Amino acid sequence: MSRLTTAFAAVLLALSVITPVFAATTGLVRGTITVDGKPAAGATVLLEGQGSLFKATTNSQGVYVFSLVPFGSYRVIARANGAHELQVIVNVISGHVSTVDVALSTQLKQIAQTTVTAHAGAEANPASVNTLTRTDIQTSPVNNSLNRLLETLPGVVQFSYNEPVINGFHGVTYNIDGAPLPLATTSNFAEIIDPKLINSLEVLTGAIPAEYGGDRMGGVVNIISNRPTDIPQGTYGSITGGFGNQAQGIGSFDVESRTGLSEFFLSANMQTTDRGLDAPTYTPINDAASNNDQFFRFITQLTPRSTLAFDYSNQFSQFQIPINTDPNNPLDPIVSAPGTLDTQLEYERFSNLNWTQVSQDGNGVFQLIPWWRSTRIDYYGDLPLDVLAVEPDFSVCPPTCDKTIHVVGLNQGSYASYIGLRGSDFRATKNHAWKVGFDVSRENATAYQEFACYYVNCAASGPVATPFFPAYTTPQGQAGSQIGIYAEDRWQETPNILWSYGLRYDASTGYVSGNQISPRIGVNLWDGGKNVAHIYYGRFYAAPLLEDVRQACVLLSAQQACSTTNPVYDLKPESDAYLEMGDVYTFNPRFTLGINIFEKSVVNVLDTTQLFNTPIFAVYNNSIGINHGAELRLQEQEPGGDQWFLTTTYSGSYAACISGSEFLFPPNTNQPGVSCVAQLSLEDHSQTVDSTAAYTHRFGGGPQLWYATLQGNYGSGFPVQFEDANINLNGTLPAHTTLDFSLGRNLTPGKSGEDQGLGLSLQVLNLLNHQYVIKVANGFNTTQIANGRNFLLRLTAPF
């Protein structure tokens, strides 16, 4: 046996993932270091990767523990006096514990260095859990959009206005740096966080543990803003400026500082464009947008076993609402008066404080996270001109679509504030690890809505109001609460079998109250070789956020004001049952294939329709919904630094009947005498095939700071008719393929004194300028056309 083979055999790996862990974005790494078979007391263990460096010293039994490790790929480096150094590559998974035992030897001194890669075995991530590292994000052509980044992953479909649809239905649960970040459906065009602030992210489209719940659960997105970094003491930063076509302009200021055991990160960004939202015309009319945001993060080591972190974010965004003024536009039957200018202003703030206490042996963690968020949305309609717009009367279309009506103008505003507390306690033993925790929050929301009609009293005909008739104004004010309590465990029955199980209780109050007990159970089965099979079943409960609730009324078809006597607010909580089965095949440690088959059934689907001729969503309940499909991800990290991936999702989502918030529905969708099952029809956001593939080439000498990425995107097209809103339309829109490209040079944080030169990023989206139709107006949606070729060039100077 060769010495190199002996060195590989000397590394004893028992990577045993034991439980969902303390924070939503971290895992635990532990193990034992031995020298010639004996525990190595005082050995040095380094954990290096993702720009971070952690250091530990083994105890008298040779045991080491890294208790708070953000997800990603790392090297465990073991060193002991007189022994040969060994390195083990390990993938740290959010919510898991990885045990890496390393056996050193004094007989291998002639070998300069040995590096091996650990096979995760039964602890491997299911195919429905995927991550994007800082490198993935930096090299992506779509890294200027969080939603577009998510849409490169399996199970995620790109819908209108870049909304990510996961597992067939609306709704994504976000966590940032371990704290929840609730997001309503109805109003926001801006993304929940500027992607320039993101270090890495993890997406769970399935295998969702019991610690997550209470909100819409199409998927869970865990975001790390800034990691503890391996930089020298001092202050470092960069300034970025950029420009592009479509009047794009961008500027960023980033600074990070390390003093003693503390670090802080500060980022300020601004961006403008003349092409903000998907427009109903190929050349947008009134489509300017801008965004300004600031983000601050502070991390400090209070004691050797406790840490404190603080986040604060402020964001302001403005959007013009694009219109169509051409009555002969074959794609958009909604025709606005020239000069109509509606706008929306969005104000977002959030903060959280994260206190973590690690047990003396490192295998237990207690965490407490108070958090706060506020959101204000103001939609300013150009009411005198809004009421001059006309559209087909979808309530009688068919048999005829020739009859036109004047649309209803809209002014609305909403404000919501949240305050909450998240707590958890985790403990790992040899074969078990358990976690118990809670999430409690309180929301206060206020809102107003003003409608404007063309005719007096909002009649279908008669005297014309000048400049418009104010149809309805309804102030809303409501408080609500959510509480979630859970307990979960992961049991390593054998090296080949890993059980995950938990129970969660959710209760919510507001306009409508509800509660549910949700079991979750899954098992990983490792064949001892390259396959890890996975089966999972879970129940989910999703309470609607208060700003998503509107008074139930049918306004569009009657063009009459809603009743002011006993207004009904009846948007109901959603209840899901989800089943998945999948397999991860490891060709080699850097090359994997994941396949997942899933089925979801839903009661009281929290679904959306667009409000009048605006891009704003109104939320309602479909009585039932189903989704089924399969997802695939093939990815490889080549030894030379190049990497590539292929993601494909094949799915179909269906819904029927209306059970809550009957708002703006022209037809009677609940057909008498016909079961809802018999009425199931494709959701408007159901795209049968959605696929993305990309290849990244790294170059530029030793550090390989340069990269070039080519990405292809394919979609089979969305349905043009849903819920019988317009059965004159049928089928799906044509399939579409686009190409994106990026070229750039990265800068290394904290290396400004060494890294001479500028950072560069060139992104060209829709390289072939293929402007395809995303949606057509059908009573549920407005017409939206994809953006054409656009480029953005950014230069970054370090200091």
Predicted segments with their positions:
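Extracytoplasmic beta-strand/coil segments of soluble accessory domains associated
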Residues: 145-182, 199
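Short, acidic, small-residue-rich periplasmic hinge/interaction motif at the N-terminus
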Residues: 34-38, 44-50, 79-83, 93-139, ...
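Short acidic/polar hinge/loop motifs at secondary-structure boundaries
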Residues: 139, 179-207, 296
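Transmembrane beta-barrel wall of Gram-negative outer-membrane proteins
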Residues: 243-272, 282-322, 343-363, 428-431, ...
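Gram-negative outer-membrane beta-barrel transporters
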Residues: 494, 498, 597-601, 618-721
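Membrane-embedded beta-barrel scaffold of Gram-negative outer-membrane proteins
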Residues: 365-383, 526, 570-621, 625-628, ...
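A beta-strand signature from Gram-negative outer-membrane beta-barrel systems
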Residues: 152-153, 193-238
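C-terminal beta-signal and adjacent terminal beta-strands/loops
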Residues: 702, 713-721, 745-799
